[in-house]
Regions:
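P-loop NTPase Walker
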Residues: 1-173, 577, 581
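Conserved ATP-driven helicase/translocase motor core recognized via long
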Residues: 39-42, 203-298
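Conserved helicase NTPase motor core
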Residues: 51-91, 153, 285-399, 419, ...
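Helicase P-loop NTPase motor core
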Residues: 92, 96-99, 410-412, 419-519, ...
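Conserved P-loop NTPase-based nucleic-acid remodeling module centered on helicase motor cores
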Residues: 116, 121-246, 395-398, 523, ...
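Conserved RecA-like helicase ATPase core segment
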Residues: 354-457, 580, 588, 601
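A short beta-strand element within the Helicase C-terminal
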Residues: 522, 526-555
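C-terminal accessory regions
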Residues: 545-550, 555-602
Length: 602
């Protein structure tokens, strides 16, 4: 076992002790093989004069208070010479400023044209913040790169895809934006940041469902099989399609079938599977799940046809079509049109999906095949990967060289940003302890940089906590933590972050809070990237129940070593880690009883 752990450490993956009863070991190989090499194994040419000029200008910018002086590990990222680089950037590691300086080095010292460079950030909000930082630093460098050029450079995945969709797919409208008057068709946001279906979207899905029920007897049969209801009497007029709620095993909530179809279809496409090509009979699933998938295929075909008639596309559909056209050699997607993707810097890479990986592969394979130099810098932290329920996975970041192969025997450069400038040591160590049972992760040695103020502490569990009974005590505690932040002259913009998994829980708590208190409330997913002097968590991070259908889909897609259930068990612990690492000098966690992510803290 010691040899196995040593070998796993060399690969950057934590070995899983089978005696822990964690299910399938992480060493299980996905069926998907590495494709032919895309990236040059040769280093990017950087002269000593270029490096020296960058170091000198950074020193002047730091002296002027424009930026902080980079650490040695940050300099390694800024000056990296490899065309294919993976950066493990831990919580609070200063990656955003480092990313800005890397872009400045490329634009101002390596003379990369802004028209050949794209920086991908997670949401429109994070893009806006990154653009603002980049413009400020470029101004100090007296660069001619202006706000318009920076706006073109810094995008979400969906915004970058949208540029190609407008040029090649006929400027489609987006299904995800139906009914959203604030949405921008030219700047689509990452749907991971979005909410529930709106009325216009639900109506279109419902119409497709009703049409299938009316026109397809097999579909009708599957619907009644799934709902456990009697099919309509063939001697009588056909009733409307049933709208009773349906709960798929593994899902938390019941919903009308058309909503459940849409949710699972999004997941299926996100993990790189084309719904119409799914070999339902070959999947290792139950008869009920097979009936669900067969009905889904009929529904999805009708839904896509309805979208086409209205000039609409889903984001997933656009990624699929563009990837297929790139692979097929569509002349409208030549090297000139793709030039902006030549040099890619992608933040939050731990949250990409197989579908995004397929698109990135197709982009860079097409460019490299045309003789265009390409580079990819992927920045992420597998410890903060929390979107597996939408199809994303840290496995894609950890098995990076399989998906983004270099030519010959080359491998990606691997750099680590392990200093934590945000949280005090007790908070960091408590957060790390939560991850002890994560089956598949990159081991890191995080160093705490911030000194601990008087009264600081790691995670304090408050248990038993019943929201219905103990709300007044929680309100008093929140006020006390705001006073603590004031007493130590906290420099944080927010004194207290109130965190939970569900909006309804947070709204109930906020209803009784003094609105003048410096408190902000977010779901844990929305709080990623934020920080406050004190983090207060009001949820246990328990994994969801077993999801047999998604286990079967995970096994079929060929991208993953883990089962979906194992991925979700790991993700529930990572969610706890993300929540704790929002706190700077104190964390309080209110739970009914120690379980899930809080069990190890009790």
């Amino acid at each position: 076992l010691a040899k196995k752990k040593a070998a796993a450490a060399k690969r950057g993956v934590k070995a899983t002790d089978a005696s822990k009863g964690k299910g399938e070991p992480a060493a299980k190989k996905p069926v998907r093989r590495a494709s032919a090499g895309i990236y040059s194994a040769a280093a990017i040419k950087v002269t000593a004069a270029q490096e020296q000029a960058m170091r000198e200008t950074v020193a002047r910018a730091a002296a002027a208070g424009i930026i902080g002086a980079p650490s040695d590990e940050q300099w390694a990222m800024i000056l990296c010479r490899q065309p294919l680089t993976r950066i493990f950037a831990g919580a609070g590691s200063g990656k955003s400023t480092t990313l800005v300086l890397r872009v400045v080095f490329m634009l101002c010292h390596l003379n990369v044209e802004p028209e050949r460079l794209t920086v991908i950030s997670f949401t429109n909000a994070s893009c806006a913040e990154l653009r603002e930082r980049l413009l400020k630093v470029l101004g100090f460098w007296q660069s001619p790169v202006d706000a318009q050029a920076v706006r073109q450079c810094v995008r979400t995945f969906h915004s970058a895809m949208g540029v190609l969709a407008r040029e090649v797919l006929g400027s489609p409208g987006w299904f995800e934006q139906l009914g959203d008057k604030q949405a921008s068709a030219s700047e689509p946001d990452n749907p991971l940041a979005g909410g529930r279906l709106g009325p216009a979207q639900a109506r279109l899905l419902k119409d497709a469902y009703q049409a299938c029920y009316t026109d397809d007897p097999a579909f009708r049969g599957w619907v009644h099989e799934l709902l456990g209801s009697q099919p309509p009497d063939p001697q009588k007029a056909l009733p409307k399609a049933p709208m009773q709620p349906f709960r798929l095993p593994g899902e938390l909530h019941a919903a009308p079938l058309f909503e459940v179809f849409y949710g699972q279809a999004g997941f299926i496409e996100s993990i790189g599977i084309r719904i119409e090509q799914l070999p339902v009979a070959a999947l290792a699933c139950s008869p009920a799940e097979r009936a669900f998938l067969l009905a889904l295929q009929v529904f999805w075909k009708a839904f896509v046809q309805e979208l086409n008639q209205q000039g609409l596309l889903t984001f997933n559909g656009a990624f699929q079509q563009l990837t297929q056209r790139l692979d097929d050699g569509d002349e409208r997607l030549g090297a000139d049109r793709l030039a902006g993707f030549s040099h890619l810097l992608i933040d939050e890479f731990q949250d990409v999906s197989p579908q995004i990986v397929q698109w990135l592969q197709a982009l860079h394979r097409r460019l490299a095949g045309a003789g265009t130099p390409v580079s990819l810098m992927a920045i992420g932290d597998d410890w903060q990967s929390i979107y597996g329920w939408r199809g994303s996975s840290p496995e894609l970041f950890m098995a990076f060289d399989r998906h983004f192969p270099s030519k010959g025997k080359g491998k990606s450069a691997v750099l680590m940003l392990q200093a934590n400038y945000r949280s005090v040591e007790p908070v960091i160590r408590a957060a790390e302890s939560i991850l002890a049972d994560v089956a598949f992760k990159q081991d890191k040695a995080t160093a705490a940089i911030r000194s601990a103020p008087p009264g600081s502490h790691g995670v304090k569990l408050v248990t038993p906590f019943d929201p219905a009974r103990d709300l007044s005590a929680l309100h008093r505690e929140i006020a006390a933590q705001c006073e603590y932040a004031r007493s130590i002259d906290s420099r944080e913009r927010t004194a207290v972050l109130l965190l939970g998994r569900r909006n309804d829980t947070l709204k109930d708590i906020q209803a009784g809070l003094d609105r003048k208190l410096p408190v902000k409330a977010y779901t844990i997913h929305r709080a990623k990237g934020l920080q406050a002097e004190v983090a207060i968590i009001v949820d246990d991070c328990l994994p969801t129940t077993a999801h047999p259908l998604r286990n079967a889909l995970y096994a079929h897609c060929g991208f993953f070593a883990n089962s979906y259930d194992q991925a979700m068990a790991d993700e529930s612990l990572r969610l706890g880690y993300v929540a704790v690492t929002r706190g700077v000098s104190r964390v309080l966690w209110f739970v009914r009883k120690p379980q899930g992510a809080t069990r190890v803290l009790s």
